[in-house]
Swiss-Prot record:
The lineage of its organism: Bacteria, Pseudomonadati, Campylobacterota, Epsilonproteobacteria, Campylobacterales. Monomer. It comes from Campylobacter jejuni subsp. jejuni serotype O:23/36 (strain 81-176). Belongs to the phosphoglycerate kinase family. InterPro entries: Phosphoglycerate_kinase, Phosphoglycerate_kinase_CS, Phosphoglycerate_kinase_N, Phosphoglycerate_kinase_sf. This is Phosphoglycerate kinase.
Length: 400
C-alpha cells in the first residue's frame, strides 16, 4: 500500500498537527477504562510528532452519544494518556467551541491538546464539511491513525481531508500497519489459510464470508451465526439464534465452498441452555439434538477438538468473532480454548474485531497472537475487498 501518504513523508517541524485517533475504549459503570489497548496503540504516532517538534491536537469519538453527556466525555482518556506518555494533556471542554479554539491557538511546540468527544457534534457522523473546516482551521497538518473508523465517511475521517494537500495529510503508524497487514493477508497468505468466523449474526459477515471463500483453504463457522447454517442443513436448532431470511444465502455459501474445494466446518456439538444466563442449567448436546425450547450458546468439547484439528496444519489463521456468548462465564469456554489453540500454533494469527480481541485478552493470549487489529468493521470491509473512505482520502493522486 505504498501509495498511501505516510506521516514520514510530511515535514512536521513547528507545525500544529491534528491526529484522528480511535480512543473508543470500553469503560465500567464508574467510567474506569477497562482496556486501554487502543490508547496505547496511538502512542508511537504521538511520540513521533512530539520528537519532530510539533504541537499536537488529538481527536476521537467515544461510544454513540445521543446528546452531550459526561458519561461519554474523553476526560478518562486524557488521564490515561497523560499517565502513559508521562506528560500533561490539555483537555478541551468542547470540540470546535470557544474553549477548544482558544486552547488550540495557544498550544506551544511539544504540547498536546485533546478535544472533547467528536460525536458531541451532530455533524461528525454526517460527514459535515462545515465541521470538518472548523477542525482543519486549527492545524496545518492532518494525520489519520484511527483504523477502527476508516470504513466510515465521517467529518474527522473523510471530509476534513479535503482541506489539506498531499504535503499536509497522511497516515499514522498504526493505520499504515493495519492496512499493510490486511492487504498482505489477502494477497499473499501462507497456506493452508484458515478463516475462523464467529459472532452472533450472519448478516454482518455475509459479504466477508463470500469474499473469503475463494481465498481460504478451510473455513470454520462458530458463534450464534453457525445456527443459521445448521438450520440450512436441515438440523433442528431449538430456540437458538436464527436469521431465517438468510437461510438461502447460507446454503449458497455452503454450495460455493463445495464447488471451490474449500472445507467448511460447523459445530458438531453445542453447550445448550433454556436461557442465556449464568444461573440456568446447561448440557452438552450434539448439534442435531438441541432440545425444544433450549438454545445453543457455545461450541461444545467435541467441536473444540475438531476445530483444534482443523487449524493444526494452518500457516495463516484469520479470526473474527467469538464462538459463543463469551461474556457469560459458562458459555465462554469454547472461545477461550480457540484462543489458546490459535495462539499456541506456528501460524501467522490475525485477530479482528473488538469482541474477539476481548476474548484473546481474557484468555491471556494477546502477546502470542501475530497481530490484533484495532478495528472490527474496518478489518471486515478490507477483507471484503472494499476501499475504506478514510484510506482512499490519503492516497497519493499520482498512483491512483
Amino acid at each position: 500500500m505504498s501509495d498511501i501518504i505516510s506521516i514520514k513523508d510530511i515535514d512536521l517541524a513547528k507545525k500544529k498537527v491534528f491526529i484522528r485517533c480511535d480512543f473508543n475504549v470500553p469503560q465500567d459503570d464508574f467510567l474506569n477504562i477497562t482496556d486501554d489497548r487502543r490508547i496505547r496503540s496511538a502512542i508511537p504516532t504521538i511520540r513521533y510528532c512530539l520528537d519532530n517538534g510539533c504541537s499536537v491536537i488529538l481527536a476521537s469519538h467515544l461510544g454513540r452519544p445521543k446528546e452531550i453527556s459526561s458519561k461519554y466525555s474523553l476526560e478518562p482518556v486524557a488521564k490515561r494518556l497523560a499517565r502513559l506518555l508521562d506528560k500533561e494533556i490539555v483537555m478541551a471542554k468542547d470540540v470546535i467551541g470557544e474553549d477548544a479554539k482558544t486552547k488550540a491557538m495557544n498550544l506551544k511546540v511539544g504540547e498536546i491538546l485533546l478535544l472533547e468527544n467528536l460525536r458531541f457534534e451532530k455533524g461528525e457522523t454526517k460527514n459535515d464539511e462545515n465541521l470538518a473546516k472548523e477542525l482543519a482551521s486549527m492545524v496545518q497538518v492532518y494525520i489519520n491513525d484511527a483504523f477502527g473508523v476508516c470504513h466510515r465517511a465521517h467529518s474527522s475521517v473523510e471530509a476534513i481531508t479535503k482541506f489539506f494537500d498531499e504535503k499536509h495529510k497522511g497516515a499514522g503508524f498504526l493505520l499504515q500497519k493495519e492496512i499493510d497487514f490486511a492487504s498482505n493477508l489477502i494477497k499473499h497468505p501462507a497456506r493452508p489459510f484458515v478463516a475462523v468466523v464467529g459472532g452472533s449474526k450472519v448478516s454482518g459477515k455475509l459479504q466477508a464470508l463470500t469474499n473469503l471463500l475463494p481465498k481460504v483453504d478451510k473455513l470454520i463457522i462458530g458463534g450464534g451465526m453457525a445456527f443459521t447454517f445448521l438450520k440450512a442443513l436441515g438440523y433442528d436448532i431449538g430456540n437458538s439464534l436464527l436469521e431465517e431470511e438468510l437461510l438461502e444465502e447460507a446454503n449458497k455459501i455452503l454450495t460455493k465452498g463445495k464447488n471451490l474445494g474449500v472445507k467448511i466446518y460447523l459445530p458438531v456439538d453445542v453447550v445448550a441452555a433454556p436461557a442465556c444466563s449464568q444461573d440456568v442449567p446447561m448440557k452438552f448436546v450434539p448439534a442435531q439434538e438441541i432440545p425444544n425450547g433450549w438454545m445453543g450458546l457455545d461450541i461444545g468439547p467435541a467441536s473444540v477438538r475438531l476445530f483444534k484439528e482443523v487449524i493444526s496444519d494452518a500457516q495463516t489463521i484469520w479470526w473474527n468473532g467469538p464462538m459463543g456468548v463469551f461474556e457469560i462465564d459458562k458459555f465462554s469456554k469454547g472461545s477461550i480454548k480457540m484462543s489458546h489453540y490459535i495462539s499456541e500454533g506456528h501460524a501467522t494469527s490475525v485477530v479482528g474485531g473488538g469482541d474477539t480481541a476481548d476474548v484473546v485478552a481474557r484468555a491471556g493470549d494477546a502477546d502470542e497472537m501475530t497481530f490484533i487489529s484495532t478495528g472490527g468493521g474496518a478489518s471486515l470491509e478490507l477483507i471484503e475487498g472494499k476501499e475504506l473512505p478514510g484510506v482512499k482520502a490519503l492516497r497519493s493522486k499520482e498512483n491512483e
